[in-house]
């Protein structure tokens, strides 16, 4: 009877290639707990994370090809939903705010840094698949280091 009354759990498991299991749920902003689980990934978060991850991976590839060393990459991405022209809720804007630290004998110029992000955006097939405006607001910083792992840290 709970299902017919729309009081069922939205918790579910998402299985990825390679065996990764991620717990998913509707957003608690859309469906209140206990029918949703706030600690689980919701589709809105997954979409923004996919755009962020795609941009990061293309950026790292391009930086590596250019002979640059990226020590850390962290993105504080955000998605914005509004009513679209058809009166339906949709992502209208996704903003990526990557903070990137470089080291090594060659550091990118400001122009090269901007071009890397432009090319990363142009070659991100996830971003190319969406109608939402995608804005990149990168920051080149120093002092961003990994959390003591002894290896670079990439987080989107």
Regions found by a protein language model. Name each.
Residues 1-49, 57-156:
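Extended beta-strand/beta-hairpin segments
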